[in-house]
């Protein structure tokens, strides 16, 4: 089979310049449907079009999860960008900031329906090829429905596309109850799994990467069931007055604990399938170093490679419809020396202290729980020493907060005087302790370039910059793009730990097993050992509630800056308590260390109950009065 990847790229470019109204009764491709299924070549292009309908994970203005929880922010000059406006709580039903209801996803679902109806008649495809493509498109259809459900709550499942001659009244659909929506999505995925049509292992990776595998189907099912079991969708009495036209609750009002058991079984099955397919956690041995590195630098680079090392063994499915290219990376990158060209590293994206402080100490427990960590003085100054030379420049001052942190802190974040190995023609020294680092105090080479090109908090999301992106010289950069990692194994392992913990009366070895796999890869000891030896709450891992907090924090750390926290904080219903806060950083306008390392407000974040779901655009309700608006909008 020809490579579908190139067709995906072309389709992605096309979808960016087109739109489609969900209520249009004429399918997008009705005029060319006969041609679309003429032969193998046109069908492969159509399949790529279906894949291109996925939400653009790497687009900060169309992915609500990048800035939606403000785990990352833009500087104030770009605070009016749609993504930031969404995160700051300025969405509205009359002018929806990120609108998936009117276009895009429903259009993609219609494309999927058309594809499944038409591909069966293509003569130069064998039956295996047809069934595989149908399974792929059915999984795409399930994914798009799930995304809509996660974002809007009750949706209008598009089981079949309406005929072209359907009346206006006939296409005016109703929102269905949440449980019915979830049930339909699970049924779609089960049909895919039961068909056994998706490959366990790609036989020709160069032409198949980016397509769905059996592992992806099982992980998606596990994720859907995990969400269905979570507080937002399971017995959510906050929506007791949100009723459909028949006076029935859109959200079930009685908590069902057995859903966690079902989710746990699905997660374990997904883990088993992934293991049989060779999916595993990315390790230090997977990172190819050109020079001998210290264990510290090697681990940091490997943890960066988890995200940006293309098609690495941890990736279950990467979104080739949304590539992390120079557009996003340049906003996360910085300068390592004086440059005469200030258009390479735009450095608009920053990580606030609320995210920075989540990462564990080097003992693998929260810094506010570590009995040995100088938490009270974390904003004070400390000078880099030989012990920390692979993380912080020796002899330079930075905050206590940046010392004695776990390896994921240093792989995820760049900071003033913090080592940043690689990514430059002169940044792979024989002794990696001599690698370059940002200098970000006012007037230094990493501080503001052109107007608006500065880091607002003093922390860069280094994680999102490819390990193979590099300065060719002081003034030019070669960017290496990579597909956004929408499904990866570490996420699945933590999902498994969460579902198991919630399904049991108290955590046990099975719960610890899955979270400890992720921690071990990050260079940390197991949960029980770490809390027993260093935490001022040594018994926390022994209770269901304690492990819930630990697992949630582990997800916030392991998946930081990947847009996962936005969805997690919604399904856990923790956003209301966590996201009414000051967004803070360092005083980036100061030139001395004493003045720079002063906690400084950047934004005020607000969140209310209505923000758990986005509003249906008012224009859609005008067109279809049968749609009921989400509460609060």
Model-derived features: where do they sit?
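Short coil/turn linking the two alpha-helices of tandem helical-hairpin repeats
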Residues: 149-150, 156, 227-236, 502-505
